[in-house]
Swiss-Prot record:
SMART domains attached to this UniProt entry: C1 (SM00109), FCH (SM00055), RhoGAP (SM00324)
Protein encoded by which gene: ARHGAP45
Protein name: Rho GTPase-activating protein 45
Source taxonomy: Eukaryota, Metazoa, Chordata, Craniata, Vertebrata
GO cellular component: cytoplasm; ruffle membrane
Superkingdom of origin: Eukaryota
């Protein structure tokens, strides 16, 4: 195609120009040609210069109207009709089929589509400065250069066609095709920049269509329809460009589409429309890529269009209606959202009361958390809807609509005013023209009459000359008057013409101004709609994004529940009396005055004198029955000393399952005191199920200890209230002055209580849940604990580990190591918040024995998560994550090398290498961070060692603690994509630290109790004392093999724990109950050698007492038992003299040994 066009052009002997009107016209000279070409080249650069390196998006395509707009031609003076006007050259008919492709301009070079006969303007100069005829090259060298460039462009299109339509390299064809298209467009841009007159609408439109077809082409499928469309687009751009080159060489350039710029308005020149850039570059194709024309081109197009202002005003009016419809839609939708959120809140409130009414229900914590999340979602949605209505959408859009309507009406009024002025001027012009015509006719008639009178006077006789003279004079006066009137009418007519021209020009000025103002108003409204829409959908995303995470969390937590777990817990917590044994024996009839031997035997089956009180010291031992009547020999009377118990003395007929004997009324029920010296409400020695596991007989004399001092019963104004264990440690009195409650953090005015020693204030109703113990000194103010810098919290601890970490870890290790899902299952939010508040109010004095293990673990995770900088500093994050990535990559490579089979030795080598590298990196941590991290990981290692029970593997703990202990430096985004991607790597680091704890911190982790046992079930070893049983070494009593999980969960069995006593009693079968009814559980030893030394465990409060005793001691060298008994003045001492051999629970059997030389032992 291009070669044929080239041959035709080379055969052209000269360059001629056809005149559309058919009349001959002078040909332009050579210098004129050159100057015209120079002017054309000096115009702004083609927008293809702005094409990005990658391909632009599909250009929009619209069909332009083939209409000639009014007001575009220049008004010529009446006397200049002989001058040839600006040429309006007609497009060759052979190219008329491509006119529809020029729908609208794609460049900023003012190439507007105004019909088939319109072309882009030559320059940006005013119409008076334009040449009257088109320009073209005059030198053969220019033609040869142009044809060479055209040949390069044709070669680029051929390469593009081959690349797109080839059948091989399916995957590599797309980038190769884009590269070929970019090369062809680059050549085309160079040609247009060199010859600006080739920048036609048809060429740019065809280029946009070709770009769209190439980008939308499916290279992986053989679609004939797409290939046909691509070939058609390729042919279209070739034909359009070759036609432009032909017209350029023939000189057929149309300049009739120039903008009619109002005189005197320099701001509307083409230079100012394109901007004051250094090179005058017009708007780039980026604007076209975005789907809209540059603002200046839109105004110019409407200026040339008939009724352009009315069309713009109509669009502005429709836009105001559109904004109103948007506001209506969002109002209705937000109303529905508000109703749903309020209904959800109301439903959650009502259901929460009914759902949480009964404890120990299946998945109760899951649904409690779900209800809390529903409440939070409803509250957040209500706030979001309120924000939408008042700040981000409704109000701004409503104000913008009102302003939009106001400005539209003002612009419309100004436009109509200008139109009315022009109409008045045109009406005056028509009237003046009519008057002028009438006066001229009257003047002509008067002149005719004067001429006729003169002829009559010349033909009359000399005697009648006076009458003719008078008639002539009269007609001359009339002719003079008619002439004057005609001149006045002509002057009026000229004035009206000038006024009409002025009003017409003013109308054009008003049109330009109105279009600019309308577009400004529309753009402002567009921006407001855009901002409001972004704010709306962003807010909706923020409200709905957490929902999938919450549902996934609830799903994972629900998977950890075992069916029947809550029912078992409910049965274990039942405080019911034992069902009495009913015997159906034959009883022969006896007389009314005689008793049956069977009845006498039943009445004498229990002798209460076996239960020796303080006054029974020195009395001979008596034989009595135990739980099932098995005889047990007692030795307490022969000991000659009294010791104190750390639990209450309680006897009950129903609880013991025995009939009361004589003297049973001498026993009183005492309540146990806590180790801090005051009463405890929940430590009464009563089995939760009301069973015989801790009978009254055992309670009265367990471990051979009898009360030495009376235990104080709670007194004062709150003695009849239900007090928590921590509340019973305070000396309470009525509140005297208003204060803030340390439990619920609200003010107390009436019905309040305060401690006489620590001045703690609390509501009366809050005493049931109070978790802060009495410190026997004034309680300090509230501490900002959560969210505080870690160095401040660790500064107060001697070893660098904050007290909250120690407190939570110790409590979990004491009674929740074997709890299933520990750290994985979330606690109840309200209880967790109360515990956090208690830690900030009471610090180390918080009582955790009544808290749920999951709540305690949640508090610990929350504290670590809210640290401004995690335990593992930000500066180590990227190195640790990179190390985890390398480790995972190495494992994957090793697995691939072994053909998919996991080699444990290679994986272990990779993990050990990673652990060594972790050890080197963690040495850079601050001392307090490293100490706390080591303390926490030692605890997690202990949890992993019993993973068969708690189901918490190192991987699970890594998933939980990875984002908590190791997280990147925070950014502006709520959740960055990189942090989500790094979750597996964070978990990998923590998992390696747990598994290789000893290698990382260069010490061996402590083994849990039972770890030294040869049996594989890892049962806890229980050391018990049998004060009333004399047996030699090697006496063995079998135990039940099936013990409840509750007994195995406790790592250290304390003498102060009721649950430990209850669990130990459940370990014994009914056949050995008589022999083991007075067992005392001691702490398990760390090794086989230390088992014989019977070193007991200490609770947190006992350690506090020992520390105080050492500080207040007088330096004597008394035994620890003497110092402790001297310190405990109002509570039972924990001194236990155990001269008899200890009993050990090993492998489901109890082994007794003899050890006569025993020292007092701390329990």
């Amino acid at each position: 195609m291009f070669s044929r066009k080239k041959r035709e052009l080379m055969k052209t002997p000269s360059i001629s120009k056809k005149n559309r009107a058919g009349s001959p016209s002078p040909q332009p000279s050579g210098p004129h040609f050159i100057s015209g070409e120079t002017e054309a080249v000096s115009r702004p650069e083609n927008p293809f210069n702005e094409l990005p390196s990658d391909l632009p998006k599909e250009l929009p395509r619209k069909d332009g109207a083939d209409a000639v707009f009014p007001g575009t031609s220049l008004e010529l003076p009446a006397g200049s009709s002989g001058v040839k006007a600006t040429g309006t050259l007609k497009r060759p008919t052979s190219l008329s089929r491509h006119a529809s492709a020029a729908g609208f301009p794609l460049s900023g070079a003012a190439s507007w589509t105004l019909g088939r006969s319109h072309r882009s303007p030559l320059t940006a100069a005013s119409p008076g400065e334009l040449p009257t005829e088109g320009t073209g090259p005059d030198v053969v060298e220019d033609i040869s250069h142009l044809l060479a460039d055209v040949a390069r462009f044709a070669e680029g299109l051929e390469k593009l066609k081959e690349c797109v339509l080839r059948d091989d390299l399916l995957e590599a064809r797309r980038p190769l095709a884009h590269e070929c298209l970019g090369e062809a467009l680059r050549v085309m841009r160079q040609i247009i920049s060199k010859y600006p007159l080739l920048n036609t609408v048809e060429t740019l439109t065809a280029a946009g269509t070709l770009i769209a077809k190439v980008k939308a082409f499916h290279y992986e499928s053989n679609n004939d329809l797409e290939k046909q469309e691509f070939e058609k687009a390729l042919e279209t751009i070739a034909v359009a460009f070759s036609s432009a080159v032909s017209e350029f060489l023939m000189g057929e350039v149309d300049s009739s589409t120039l903008l009619a710029v109002p005189p005197g308005d320099s701001s509307q020149s083409m230079e100012s429309l394109y901007g004051s850039g250094s090179e005058g570059t017009p708007p780039s194709l980026d604007d076209c890529d975005a789907g809209c024309l540059p603002a200046e081109e839109v105004d110019v197009l409407l200026q040339r269009c008939e009724g352009g202002v009315d069309a713009a005003l109509l669009y502005a009016k429709n836009m105001a209606k559109y904004m109103k419809d948007l506001i209506s839609y969002l109002e209705k939708r937000t109303t529905l959202e508000m109703e749903f959120a309020k209904g959800l809140q109301k439903m959650a409130h009502n259901c929460r009361q009914s759902v949480t009414q009964e404890p120990h229900m299946p998945l109760l914590s899951i649904y409690s958390l779900a209800l809390e999340q529903d409440l939070e979602f409803g509250h957040g949605m209500v706030q979001a809807v309120g924000t939408l209505q008042t700040q981000t959408f409704m109000q701004p859009l409503t104000l913008r609509r009102l302003e939009h309507e106001k400005r539209r009406k003002e612009i419309k009024e100004a436009w109509h005013r200008a139109q009315r002025k022009l109409q008045e001027a045109e009406s005056n012009l028509r009237k003046a023209k009519q008057g002028y015509t009438q006066r001229c006719e009257d003047h002509d008639k008067a002149r005719f009459l004067v001429a006729k009178a003169e002829e009559e006077q010349a033909g009359t006789a000399p005697g009648a000359g006076s009458t003719a003279t008078k008639t002539l004079d009269k007609r001359r006066r009339l002719e003079e008057e008619a002439k004057n009137k005609a001149e006045e009418a002509m002057a009026t007519y000229r004035t009206c013409v000038a006024d009409a021209k002025t009003q017409k020009q003013e109308l054009e000025d008003t049109k330009v101004t109105a279009l600019r103002q309308i577009q400004e108003v529309i753009r402002q409204s567009d921006q407001t709609i855009k901002s409001a829409t972004i704010s709306y959908y962003q807010m909706m995303h923020m409200q709905t994004a957490p929902l999938p995470v919450h549902f996934q969390m609830l799903c994972e937590s629900s998977k950890l529940y075992d069916p029947g777990q809550q029912y078992a817990s409910h049965v274990r917590q039942l405080q019911r009396d034992q069902e009495p044994d009913v015997h159906y024996d034959f009883e022969p009839h006896v007389s009314a005055n005689a008793w049956s031997p069977v009845m006498r035997a039943r009445k004498s089956s229990f002798n209460v004198s076996d239960v020796a009180g303080p006054e029974a010291a020195g009395s001979p031992p008596e034989e009595g029955g135990c739980i099932e009547g098995t005889p047990v020999k007692g030795h307490r009377a022969g000991r000659g000393h009294q010791v104190h118990k750390s639990w209450p003395l309680s006897i009950s007929d129903s609880a013991s399952g025995l009939d009361p004997g004589p003297g049973a009324g001498d026993f009183k029920k005492f309540e146990r005191t806590s180790s801090s010296g005051t009463m405890s409400s929940t430590e009464e020695l009563v089995d939760p199920e009301g069973g015989a596991g801790a009978s009254a007989f055992e309670q009265a004399d367990l471990n051979g200890m009898t009360p030495e001092l009376p235990v104080a019963v709670p007194s004062g104004p709150f003695r009849h209230e239900g007090l928590s264990k921590a509340a019973r440690t305070h000396r309470l009195r009525k509140l005297r002055t208003p204060a803030k409650c340390r439990e619920c953090n609200s003010y107390v005015y009436f019905q309040g209580a305060e401690c006489e020693e620590c001045c703690l204030a609390c509501h009366k109703k809050c005493l049931e849940t109070l978790a802060i113990q009495c410190g026997h000194k004034k309680l300090q103010g509230r501490l900002q604990l959560f969210g505080q810098d870690f160095s401040h919290a660790a500064r107060s601890a001697p070893d660098g580990v904050p007290f909250i970490v120690k407190k939570c870890v110790c409590e979990i290790e004491r009674r929740a190591l074997r709890t299933k899902g520990i750290y994985r299952v979330n606690g109840v939010k309200t209880r967790v918040e109360k515990l956090c508040q208690a830690f900030e109010n009471g610090k180390e004095l918080v009582e955790l024995s009544q808290a749920s293990p999951h709540d305690i673990s949640n508090v610990l995770k929350l504290y670590l998560r809210q640290l401004p900088e995690p335990l593992i500093s930000f500066r180590l994050y990227h190195e640790l994550v990179g190390l985890a990535k390398d480790s995972l990559k190495a494992e994957a490579e090793a697995k691939a090398a072994s053909r998919g089979r996991q080699d444990s030795s290679e994986s272990e080598a990779v993990a050990v290498a990673m652990a060594g590298r972790l050890r080197e990196l963690l040495r850079d941590l601050p001392p307090e961070n490293r100490a706390s991290l080591q303390y926490l990981l030692r605890h997690l290692r202990r949890i992993v060692e019993v993973e068969q029970d708690n189901k918490m593997t190192p991987g699970n703990l890594g998933i939980v603690f990875g984002p908590t202990l190791l997280r990147p430096r925070p950014t502006e985004a709520t959740v960055s994509l990189s942090s989500l991607v790094d979750y597996p790597h964070q978990a990998r680091v923590i998992e390696t630290l747990i598994v290789h704890y000893g290698l990382v911190f260069e010490e061996e982790p402590e083994e849990i109790p039972g770890g030294q046992d040869e049996s594989s079930n890892q049962r806890a070893e229980v050391v018990v004392q049998v004060p009333y049983l004399e047996a030699g070494e090697g006496v063995v009593y079998p135990l039940q093999e099936a013990a409840e999980d509750g007994c195995r969960e406790s790592r250290v069995v304390s003498n102060d724990s009721d649950s430990d006593l209850e669990e130990a009693s459940e370990l014994l079968s009914s056949s050995e109950a008589s022999a083991l009814c007075r067992l005392s559980f001691l702490e398990q030893q760390q090794s086989e050698a230390s088992l014989e030394e019977a070193s007991g465990s200490h609770s947190g409060s006992e350690e506090q007492l020992e520390t105080t005793a050492r500080e207040d001691g007088d330096g004597d060298e008394d035994s620890p038992a003497q110092r402790l008994s001297g310190f405990n003045t109002n509570q039972s001492n924990n001194v236990l003299q155990t001269p008899l051999p200890p009993m050990r629970l090993r492998g489901g059997r109890i082994t007794l040994g003899s050890c006569r030389e025993r020292q007092p032992e701390f329990v």
